[in-house]
Amino acid sequence: MLRVTVLERGRIVRGESDAHSESVRGTPQYRVLPSRLYDRLERSEVSHEERDGTGRVIDWRRRHGVVGQWVGVIQIPGLQLEILPKTDDASPEAGGGYVDATRRNLMTMLVRGGLGTVRSRGLADLSLKRATIHDRLVDAFLDRALEELERGLDRHYATEEGNLPVLRGKLVIAQQVTRNASQRHRFYCRHDALTETTPISIRLKQCCRVLVERRLPESVLTKVRDVLSILDEVPDVPFHRGHPDPVFNRQNERFEDVYSFSCMVLEGQAADARRGHVETFTLLFDMDKVFERFIAAFVQAEVIPKIDGAVARPQGKGDCRPLFHDPHAKRGVLNLKPDLIVERAGKTLVLDTKWKRLSEAKAARPSDPDLYQLYAYLHRYDCERATLLYPARAKLDRRDLDALRSKRGEKAGTIGVRFVDVSSPLWTPNGNADLARALADIISEGLGLSEPPPVEAPA
């Protein structure tokens, strides 16, 4: 199987022949594929779009395709395509150093944001050499699954019926008369029993049955088998799309991340995949969501604890406000959910992340819809400043725009355009501290603090 890496917004070009040597040509920003694999990938992606009605991962054009902002892994027979984010303006060569650093940064962002289905301990375990983002994510998922399963399997009470030698629960009179008229030592009962056959355990086992057939490093396959052995008493149930998700509560919420990842794996495999065949699957993440969740989680963990009295609310949690009110239905319309709200001492800062590349020609001017959105936040949350946060790009500087109201042009607040560097090694203490300082500066400015809190890199 040919394994290649391409960067977000990079090009996939159709080669002139079917030889695998074609893939040696180019860089992760401009990748040439053998013609047969290119055609197969295009057919697979186009049919997937038509069948599921989802947005395009690759924008197909004449003899080449342009990768969008979805990152992860696409596998078809003969090809595994890894898509990594483009985090800076560097022109990466074919060498593995740049690709490996980008891959590790993406893993850090996924783990921090919760999409990697692991907590902080997972970061230290992501040491698979030359592994794709798919292998690393699966390894992290299995570490988390094993951690939770060793604490205890998910269990719930289920109603069971049976012809028992002892009376248990409620006697079902109709069945008792029919079945046991001549067997007075038997009791047909309906009772509640504590069982490990729950939707969560079934979904975990379904996911591991799929993973055990994939080409994974042996250390990862060992973990898959460990999970399957723990779930040995859980029955094998075929996976069907559209089944309702379980209700998560305080008893089982620790499984929510691994359940979500299991659903992603199962829903990403091809509908016609068969045991023992080369599998077709996708495992993709929208970088806009990855960036949003990463920044929110990072700010909560690394910045807010250093600002006395500050509170952060991701996705407006606990403070979603409608922009309109319907007097007939007596309810709000169009609830606003800012990516991150930071409050302190009566002041409010709204942060909205955007995984976009602003144009140098327009001097870092946000799009009209983004400005309208931030103006609505200023108005509805009664704040003096709302900030758009983008990944850093060379030759672009921060800027402020005064929002106006009324004919007299009174100032309604300030919309800031700020940038953070996510191309530095985020997995290192220094990279972590650099990002924390940059975000602390932005938040302190938005809250009107005289100086940002000190952030030191661990020794």
Language-model features: locations:
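Catalytic core segments in nucleotide and nucleic-acid processing enzymes
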Residues: 1-46, 278-459
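Residue(s) in the substrate-gating loop at a strand-loop-helix junction
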Residues: 2-281
